[in-house]
Amino acid sequence: VEEIITEKSITYKYENDSIKIDLGKEYTSKETYYVTIEYISKPNELKAGGSNAITDDKGLYFINPTGADEDKMPQIWTQGETQSNSAWFPTIDNPTEKMTNEIYITVDEKYTTLSNGLLVNTQKNTDGTKTDHWVMDLPHAPYLVMMGIGEFKKVTDEPWNGKEISYYVEKEYEQHAKAIFGKTKKMIEFYSNKLGTPYPWQKYAQIVARDYVSGAMENTTATLHGDFVCYQTTRETIDGAKGEGTIAHELFHQWFGDYASCESWSNLTLNESFATYGEYLWEEFENGRDAADNHSAESRFGYFAQAQQKQVDLVRFDYNEREDMFDAFSYNKGGQIIHMLRKYVGDDAFFASLKLYLEKNKFKTAEVHDLRLAFEEVTGQDLNWFFNEWYFAKGHPELEIKKTYDGTLKKLTITINQNQDLTVAPLYKLPVFIDIYADGKKDRKQIWIEDAKHTFTFTVDKQPDLVNFDAERQLLAKIDFAKTKQELVFQYKNAPLWGDRDEAMSFFSEHANDSDIQSLLMEIAVTDPWKNIRSQAIAILATLAKEKESELKPLLVRIYHEDKNTRVRALALKTLALKYKGDDLNALYEQALNEQSYAIVSEGFDAIASLNPSLAMKKATALENEASKDLMYSIMDLYAKQGTDDNHPYFIKIKKQFSGFELMSYGNLYGKFLKRCTKSETVIDGAKVLTKLASSDNKYVKYAAQKVIKDNLMNVWQGKEDKLNGQIDKLKKENQDVTTLNAELKVVQETKKQIVDLYNSIKK
């Protein structure tokens, strides 16, 4: 360690994960000093850590550095969150810090590099290497520094306001990069306009990594995605872009998390709740309110599931490990709270408040009170009540709602009880909209629930057809409000939101034997504007397949031919195959193999496989080169049931298409297939592949592969040995020749020994 200006060595003390430097004099906060540190990083020597959200914390990762795994491109990438970047460069590794940085990366000329900011120079060296110089001249948090290296192909898209948009992918996905990430520019434009804050950084790049320890990471100007999050072929995106929500989430972080950062992990929700809500905003803009509300409900379900296991404040200072903050409270619950705040103050004030928050905290850190103050400045309201009950308290409302109508007095009375445990959760103050439908009209009322038992009375001239509590479907609460069949049918037909129809669909599912509901479901399956509700209707109707065949079978055929969504069409085809038979349907399944949608092709293939396995085996040969995981699973499943040793090359060929938890499904199907195989060389080769899987850093993949080797290979070949020994013993007693069986036994024993040796090698 030396002082740069004087090049004078200075004393320091290095202990564990920190270095203390004696600067030789006292400096004021206004003075600048320069220090250079020469160091070697050894991340692989660090004690392993991590959490469910980020499974490792050594900061710098060398993936397949020797190239021993032919299915995986060698690469280097980093993961800084929470405080892991100090594993590979000295820094004050704390979210309260802001820093600029530059990095020189020297690599073989064949490699592409990526880091924060801009690539300002590439120097070709005489030894076949090059040195890339990246400069990040805008301040950001240390955990957002990144580096990515590999034989990536850089795909450049149309710039946004002169700022480069680029995607770094493996060669195989170069032609598909714009299909995967192509909405990025539109997202940047949308978020910039919505927030009143133009995208603040120098560029925006996205890179896809193998063996990534999380899902994705919002490194400033250079987001990193795990391959399992977004890799698809262009054709696969016909059935939906699987990474679109994550792409939106990480991009929104560039404002919330990077531009304005949480000052401590206790305030992590400032980063993650907004990124989660960024997904909602994008869905709402791109795909409509139904899509956004459906997406939000899935997030809400995730919170409620974890809330059964624990109850914690959204902002909390008493966590055991900082990674504990990465949970369904910081993300899911936080996103729901942001939505409630939006619905309370209204869109104009909401987005004006976000603009003010970003302006006041740009290139700085913030805590939740800074967010409150921004909203208070814009709205002119004291919002302590809202932030206290949602950010600094546990739990959620549990509401029991009852209504009565007095026709004589023309009075509607609604009684609301807050039944949550008040020793854990607060007594909430809840602004809520109620829509009252009566006499062909809708009357919206806003109420404030403030008491443990609160009664509201409204004058209504006629018996209401429906009282729709929380008409905006924005409240994070468990709600018990009984409704009749007539009310829910009316609600489905008249209330405008996905949540209204989804609530009705839950009732319809429980009362599917009702003839009126059956007729309505037939209509819903065709006409509902949202694909998931149409699919839900099909799933409910499938339980009535036998008694409703004359109506349902032609309806499903119609949906297959006419629905505009490929997933709905695929579900209709799957339901037909599961519930009905007929030559007309067989022709339909074969025709499905010619569709562009892999979802439809896969269902058609599965149908043929279940009805005519020998025909499916013939069809599979022509489909083996299709780059669809849905179809790969279908073909593997068929081979696991009907295949022979001749089908083994297919499993070897497609292995590289799977990563992460997908390898568990691959390994299980592969094991079932190998169980059928009779040739020793096939089984040994398969056991070697499974042994590599069992050496995975992913403990779930590791365990699953070990179990497959033991159950599907060791035990099976032990059974073969036992059977042959029994046959040999019997023939010996009968004084018959056992030469042939002994030869078979020798092969079986040698095969079993090799399997056992491989198994023991991974158990050590």
Model region roles, listed by residue range:
Residues 17, 134, 160-161, 166-416:
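Hydrophobic alpha-helical and helix-loop surface patches within well-folded domains
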Residues 1-202, 327-328, 343-345, 361, ...:
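Acidic/His-enriched low-complexity segments
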Residues 79, 107, 112, 130, ...:
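Non-catalytic accessory/interaction domains
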